[in-house]
Design a protein with these regions (language model features):
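A general structural signal for short secondary-structure junctions and capping/turn motifs
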Residues: 67-69, 175-178, 260, 271
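Catalytic PLP-binding core of fold-type I/II PLP enzymes
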Residues: 250-275
Length: 275
């Protein structure tokens, strides 16, 4: 595909998506297909020759759309909002078109600095203390993660590393292996499955704590778990609260959890699904 064909395909794709989103309310939210439906509609082997973009658009209607759950439909009331928008789609187009990899400043200065600026904007909108901002003299500054699941895992790994450094500074004779074997994290039994998976990937026990009658994690439940684990020689270090759990849309009581985490020196990560 050359630039001329790309222009045609791109304009046709924009028209397709605009029509789709404009008429989304007329589509059934859930697809009426059975598991494995798509395998019967596509070749068994990867094509050896490319298809035209016109054929690809036809395949969108014939193969893909029948199996789509329409998250942006006004009739969709499950899970959490995904915040799609026309400007967001155009932003994704620019991101994909430029296609830079921003793992360091020199790989794409604009990518790195735009992320820093946007996260500072968000911090100011949330009225966070200046210590949380990149423009302060402290260690603050935000980083955009690829998904909520990734953010939970990265938070766990960062909290784990921080706790190991703190304990080794206080107890130079303690080795990392001994410390990590005693670390324990907490979340509610209503949290997303990705939280428990973060514990598995981070080689850390993730205790699923019981919730109250409104399916919320409360401070008393966390305090009891911390007390039990400390008495058993374990080291609490990480708590995951949720704003809008997947199954029940429960909001954990952060006003109770926050002070406990401060007092006990635990890292509090919030899965802000409904933020």
């Amino acid at each position: 595909m050359d630039a001329t064909e790309f222009r045609k395909f791109g304009k046709a794709a924009v028209d397709y998506l605009a029509d789709y989103l404009e008429n989304l309310r007329d589509r059934p939210v859930l697809p009426s297909v059975e598991p494995g439906y798509l395998q019967e509609m596509i070749p068994k082997e990867a094509p050896t020759q490319p298809e035209t973009w016109q054929d690809i658009l036809q395949d969108m209607d014939r193969v893909v759309m029948p199996g789509v759950t329409h998250w942006h439909s006004p009739h969709f009331h499950a899970y959490y909002p995904t915040a799609n928008s026309f400007p967001g789609i155009v932003g994704e187009m620019f991101s994909a078109g430029i296609g830079c990899i921003g793992f360091s400043w020199i790989t794409s200065p604009a990518c790195t600095e735009l992320e820093v600026a946007m996260m500072d904007w968000l911090g100011k909108l949330l009225n966070l203390p200046k210590e949380f901002l990149n423009c302060s003299d402290g260690p603050g500054g935000g980083v955009i993660q690829g998904s909520a699941s990734e953010a939970t895992l990265v938070g766990l790994l960062a909290a784990k590393e921080k706790m190991v450094k703190i304990l080794q500074a206080d107890h130079p004779d303690w080795d990392q292996g001994m410390i990590k074997a005693k670390l324990v994290a907490y979340t509610s039994d209503q949290s997303n499955s990705s939280v428990e998976k973060a514990g598995l990937l981070g080689s850390t026990p993730m205790r699923l704590l019981p919730t109250d009658e409104k399916c919320r994690l409360r401070g008393s439940m966390l305090e009891q778990a911390i007390k039990e684990d400390r008495e058993n020689g374990l080291i609490p270090f990480y708590v995951v609260g949720t704003l809008g759990t997947t199954g029940t849309c429960a909001f954990d009581d952060l006003e109770e959890l926050g002070p406990i985490c401060n007092r006990e020196n635990l890292w509090l990560h919030v899965d802000a699904a409904y933020a």
